[in-house]
């Protein structure tokens, strides 16, 4: 059911995109008054360059701003691209715009200006009706887990498959595998309330990964967890990343970020202040166990 | 779509949210019960009021010397007058028999029949009795009404005006009271159901939010809720009907054999009542849960 629709979207996207690149030169009129023009030297993130769309990037932000109706600035002209199979940290203090990026990516709301593309789809062109189908291609993990309290661990993960119209047989085949991968085989019939925070977050990751999405978003996935449990979750995300999924993690756990040594995008009051693409990356071929040892400082 | 999945989902949800489900069930039961009692009561009251109003008659008294031929002429005249619904003839002899029953000594002492032939005229509407009266009065008050019946053999026409007005006022009051009560009850029931639905949905707002995040379509989320509303409505309605049936068998049926009053006015019979109540319970709770969800689906 889903693939033909997706094909259709892709084709339509491409056609519109061609028509659009000519007209799109900056639609900033609506929110001009929020922009403070003084004492700012233009940096890379400010210039909206019409570069050709990179087919390798899965997330592509161009001059994206988000101003909330309260007057708060969520994001201010952010431009960045995330490549397929990359593991990217989004860091910054509370209110810096990390969550805004995440919420824009799941199309919870529209940007005030700028353009977001995910896997080649311009998000502004996905109609409200199509949002559910779009979201099935994105796994999301939150600080507060967001599990369904009335369902067992198994059923929580199965739900992500059920919404896509998966058959009972598919679910029977898939769910136990995913739960084994996330180390929850023994907790199959427990309800979320009976699990520890770390276990609940594992269920959330398992659910996010159930459809094998090309992109996984994690908003403060370790925010409520102790350091050792956090390492376990990061290992899990790393394993998923190694399986080919692009992972975008928003966090303020600078310790963890420093140890993981992956690409870091730093936000401050909605502005991108650092994009460490050239930073010294940690080894990308280490095993999950090796990563765990490194994070524990062994 | 997969109805089996949705049915299982709604059953699971009812089981896992036992307390809100029970609250919804109880409110549907109570509302259905109240309406189920109220429909026949309103009908009976209206029937009774109308029966009382139907007794507003205009009596046309003939001269005591009137012959059968005079009576026949008068009868046709009266029947042709506007606003007259029906005419009942009470002959001298019948009147005497009736009155003698009430007061046998007096009539025996009298020794002859002082009563005239009488026509009991029923106006087509209780409020029209004054018009009928005017038409049947010969030149009543010096200003003859157009089309008035002029028959020299009619001695007098009467309806006790004060009595009629009293009856009309009282029955109108009863009808208005019942209407106000019915409106109040319906509003109260609707508020009760709306509140229950909103409460149980509010507790699941987060659940809906999570479902949307995982990529569930609106109808994928909505179907189990709608089915749940349908089941709860059906169960609550059925329970209310069982209670009503028990009440009818034990209370009403035994009463009606004792007091003829209860059974007299035409009320809705039990089967249509059941169908109406069931349809109301199910549709209100199904639509209610389906529609109230809409607000939470906006994410």
Describe the residue ranges of each PLM region.
Chain A
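Helix-to-loop junction immediately C-terminal to a conserved catalytic motif
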Residues: 106
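Conserved ABC transporter NBD signature motif
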Residues: 114-122
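ABC ATPase NBD coupling module
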Residues: 123-139, 168, 240-242, 283-286
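Short coil-to-helix segment of the ABC ATPase nucleotide-binding domain corresponding to the Q-loop/switch region
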Residues: 151-158
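Conserved ABC ATPase signature
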Residues: 191-195, 199-201
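Conserved catalytic motifs of ABC-family nucleotide-binding domains
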Residues: 212
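Catalytic Walker B motif of ABC-type/P-loop ATPase nucleotide-binding domains
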Residues: 216-219
């Amino acid at each position: 059911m889903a693939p033909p629709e997706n094909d259709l979207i892709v084709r339509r996207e491409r056609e519109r995109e061609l028509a659009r690149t000519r007209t799109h030169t900056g639609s900033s009129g609506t929110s001009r008054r929020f922009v403070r023009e003084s004492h700012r030297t233009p940096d890379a993130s400010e210039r909206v360059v019409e570069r050709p769309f990179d087919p390798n990037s899965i997330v592509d932000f161009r001059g994206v701003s988000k101003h909330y109706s309260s007057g708060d600035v969520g994001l201010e002209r952010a431009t960045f691209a995330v490549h397929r199979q990359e593991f990217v940290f989004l860091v910054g203090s509370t209110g810096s715009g990390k969550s805004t990026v995440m919420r824009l990516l799941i199309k919870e709301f529209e940007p005030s200006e700028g353009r977001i593309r995910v896997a080649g789809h311009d998000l502004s062109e996905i109609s409200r009706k199509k949002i559910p189908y779009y979201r099935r291609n994105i796994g999301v993990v939150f600080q507060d887990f967001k599990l369904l309290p009335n369902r067992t661990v198994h059923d929580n993960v199965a739900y992500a498959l059920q919404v896509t119209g998966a058959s009972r047989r598919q679910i029977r085949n898939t769910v136990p595998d995913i739960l084994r991968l996330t180390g929850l085989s023994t907790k199959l019939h427990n309800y979320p309330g009976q699990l520890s925070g770390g276990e609940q977050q594992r269920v959330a990751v398992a659910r996010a990964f159930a459809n094998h999405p090309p992109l996984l978003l994690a908003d403060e996935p370790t925010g409520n967890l102790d350091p050792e449990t956090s390492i376990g979750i990061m290992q899990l995300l790393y394993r998923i990343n190694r399986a080919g999924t692009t992972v975008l993690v928003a966090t303020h756990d600078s310790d963890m970020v420093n140890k993981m040594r992956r690409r870091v995008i730093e936000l401050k009051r909605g502005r991108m202040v650092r994009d460490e693409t050239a930073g010294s990356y940690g080894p990308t071929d280490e095993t999950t166990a090796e990563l765990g040892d490194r994070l524990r400082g062994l | 779509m997969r109805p089996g999945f949705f049915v299982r989902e709604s059953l699971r949800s009812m089981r896992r949210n036992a307390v809100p489900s029970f609250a919804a069930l109880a409110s549907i039961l109570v509302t259905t019960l109240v309406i189920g009692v109220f429909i026949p009561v309103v009908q009976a009251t209206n029937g009774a009021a109308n029966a009382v109003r139907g007794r507003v008659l205009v009596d046309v008294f003939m001269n005591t010397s009137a012959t059968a031929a005079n009576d026949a002429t008068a009868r046709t005249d009266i029947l042709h007058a506007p606003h007259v619904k029906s005419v009942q003839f009470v002959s001298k002899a019948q009147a005497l028999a009736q009155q003698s029953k009430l007061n046998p000594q007096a009539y025996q002492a009298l020794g002859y029949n002082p009563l005239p032939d009488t026509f009991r005229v029923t106006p087509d509407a209780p409020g029209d009795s004054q018009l009928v009266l005017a038409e049947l009065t010969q030149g009543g008050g010096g200003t003859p009404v157009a089309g008035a019946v002029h028959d020299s053999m009619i001695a007098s026409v009467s309806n006790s005006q004060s009595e009629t007005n009293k009856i009309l006022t009282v029955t109108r009051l009863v009808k208005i009271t019942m209407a106000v009560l019915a409106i109040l009850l319906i509003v109260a029931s609707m508020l009760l159901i709306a509140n229950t639905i909103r409460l149980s949905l509010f507790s699941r707002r987060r659940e809906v939010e999570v479902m949307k995040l995982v990529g569930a379509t609106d109808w994928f989320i909505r179907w189990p809720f709608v089915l749940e509303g349908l089941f709860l409505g059906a169960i609550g309605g059925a329970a209310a009907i069982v209670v009503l049936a028990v009440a009818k068998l034990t209370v009403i049926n035994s009463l009606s054999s004792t007091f003829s009053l209860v059974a007299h006015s035409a009320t809705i019979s039990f089967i249509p009542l059941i169908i109406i109540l069931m349809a109301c319970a199910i549709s209100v709770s199904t639509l209610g849960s389906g529609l109230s969800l809409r607000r939470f689906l906006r994410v």
